Amino acid sequence: MDHTEGSPAEEPPAHAPSPGKFGERPPPKRLTREAMRNYLKERGDQTVLILHAKVAQKSYGNEKRFFCPPPCVYLMGSGWKKKKEQMERDGCSEQESQPCAFIGIGNSDQEMQQLNLEGKNYCTAKTLYISDSDKRKHFMLSVKMFYGNSDDIGVFLSKRIKVISKPSKKKQSLKNADLCIASGTKVALFNRLRSQTVSTRYLHVEGGNFHASSQQWGAFFIHLLDDDESEGEEFTVRDGYIHYGQTVKLVCSVTGMALPRLIIRKVDKQTALLDADDPVSQLHKCAFYLKDTERMYLCLSQERIIQFQATPCPKEPNKEMINDGASWTIISTDKAEYTFYEGMGPVLAPVTPVPVVESLQLNGGGDVAMLELTGQNFTPNLRVWFGDVEAETMYRCGESMLCVVPDISAFREGWRWVRQPVQVPVTLVRNDGIIYSTSLTFTYTPEPGPRPHCSAAGAILRANSSQVPPNESNTNSEGSYTNASTNSTSVTSSTATVVS
């Protein structure tokens, strides 16, 4: 198998954390309330984002069909800059404090590729592929990160990627739902002139404008609209799979900017088919007609996004002739996001696996209020915190944890019951002080008075867990609790104009 020159083996050598400037680092410390308060005030998180397509086309023989759009790793949050400054204050050189990353397809047969993060917060992996000798039907990208001084950051995995042989030529049916594209999901759009890889450009938003970028790609929500939906910044969306001939709205998942209403049309050679109505499938070529215009299509011209006027086909009224720049390949995209913060300073162990909380479920009420967390990568050394209060926590499995909801008096001194709504962030904390932020909050809502005391919650935990109770428990027999909530978003957008 051909290997990229100079690439390391699939697993770069494991790096043991280097000792501090004046000897070994102190043993790990449990997080204190003061440290949590500082974190909640500053929010100096370090976030690793892995953006990638949901499907990858297999390479046969000696060919290399590079993943398109290329997987991209972003380092987000103010914590990266703060970490670098802290390392340099502690005696590291600029090179030693620089994050390094390698990416691979989780297969020991293929070498990992180094990502160049120097001087910027993102990098794309442009030469990844999966060969037909790899028999997996699904795989995950693996991103190994460490600092220039060899301190380990950890291994971060993408979401699951489906391997396909080639885009479906036959009329797609909803039986292959995993190849169809649902309303409200994210897609990338790219244009490739004369099938040349070097000419590939991606729809992207930068500086408040849509443009065709050769370096970065955007992930856009594709929303299905009613055919009679009028143009506007707010719009009503429909559920279901996207079919050709339907009205859609493309909204940038980062900026919220949107294109005007579009009708998605199937492309055959250099024509847009006006009567196609089958489901849109992965890696199909499609065109976007700007609704209520005179045959105007979304098109690129170098880096600019423009309107292109199609020509009617004289002998075929169901077709319109378009140019190459108006033909877009569509593919579903996904994102893996991992956020962490060293609450008690540098740690010896990698920060991974990073736990991800997907949902919260409140069980019971009053003194027996228990919160169930569902997600991924849970471990027994994690505790749930409500604001700056550590909760008694029970580990169930890698996807489930349970905790006792702290009494309201832990947040409002002297309160015996909830007098006004109090919202607190929910976070997970590892036993060495690593804080894992979630986007979830817990809300205490007002009640007319105290509830009767019941010690069932403590009994449930003690019966099911061998975990040591938290250092600072706040328990009280009265109080009331309500819901756990996520930050939901309504569909509003700012519509961009397309140059004619």
From Swiss-Prot:
Protein's UniProt keywords contain Glycosyltransferase: no
Localization in the cell: Nucleus; Cytoplasm
Entry GO terms, CC: chromatin; cytoplasm; MAML1-RBP-Jkappa- ICN1 complex; nucleolus; nucleoplasm; nucleus; transcription repressor complex
A GO molecular-function annotation: chromatin binding
Start and end residues of each stretch annotated as Disordered: 1-30, 465-500
Keyword annotations: Acetylation, Activator, Cytoplasm, Disease variant, DNA-binding, Host-virus interaction, Notch signaling pathway, Nucleus, Repeat, Repressor, Transcription, Transcription regulation
Keyword flag DNA-binding: yes
Family annotation (Gene3D superfamilies): 2.80.10.50, Immunoglobulins, LAG1, DNA binding domain
Pfam family, one: TIG_SUH
Amino acid composition bias (Low complexity), ranges on this chain: 482-500
Domain IPT/TIG: 355-445
GO biological process assignments: angiogenesis; aortic valve development; arterial endothelial cell fate commitment; atrioventricular canal development; auditory receptor cell fate commitment; B cell differentiation; blood vessel endothelial cell fate specification; blood vessel lumenization
Compositional bias of kind Polar residues: 465-481
Stretch list, region DNA-binding: 57-67, 165-170, 192-197
Residues the record lists as N6-acetyllysine modifications: 175
InterPro entries from the UniProt entry: Beta-trefoil_DNA-bd_dom, BTD_sf, CLS_fam, Ig-like_fold, Ig_E-set, p53-like_TF_DNA-bd_sf, RBP-J/Cbf11/Cbf12_DNA-bd, RBP-J/Cbf11_DNA-bd_sf
Described purpose of this protein according to its UniProt entry: Transcriptional regulator that plays a central role in Notch signaling, a signaling pathway involved in cell-cell communication that regulates a broad spectrum of cell-fate determinations. Acts as a transcriptional repressor when it is not associated with Notch proteins. When associated with some NICD product of Notch proteins (Notch intracellular domain), it acts as a transcriptional activator that activates transcription of Notch target genes.
Family: Belongs to the Su(H) family.
Oligomeric form and interacting partners: Interacts with activated NOTCH1, NOTCH2 or NOTCH3. Interacts with MINT/SHARP. This interaction may mediate the recruitment of large corepressor complexes containing proteins such as HDAC1, HDAC2, NCOR2, SAP30, FHL1/KYOT2 and CIR1. Interacts with EP300, MAML1 and PTF1A. Interacts with RITA1/C12orf52, leading to nuclear export, prevent the interaction between RBPJ and NICD product and subsequent down-regulation of the Notch signaling pathway. Interacts with SNW1. Interacts with CHCHD2 and CXXC5. Interacts with BEND6 (via BEN domain). Interacts with NKAPL. Interacts with ZMIZ1.
Disease linkage: Adams-Oliver syndrome 3: An autosomal dominant form of Adams-Oliver syndrome, a disorder characterized by the congenital absence of skin (aplasia cutis congenita) in combination with transverse limb defects. Aplasia cutis congenita can be located anywhere on the body, but in the vast majority of the cases, it is present on the posterior parietal region where it is often associated with an underlying defect of the parietal bones. Limb abnormalities are typically limb truncation defects affecting the distal phalanges or entire digits (true ectrodactyly).
UniProt name for this protein: Recombining binding protein suppressor of hairless
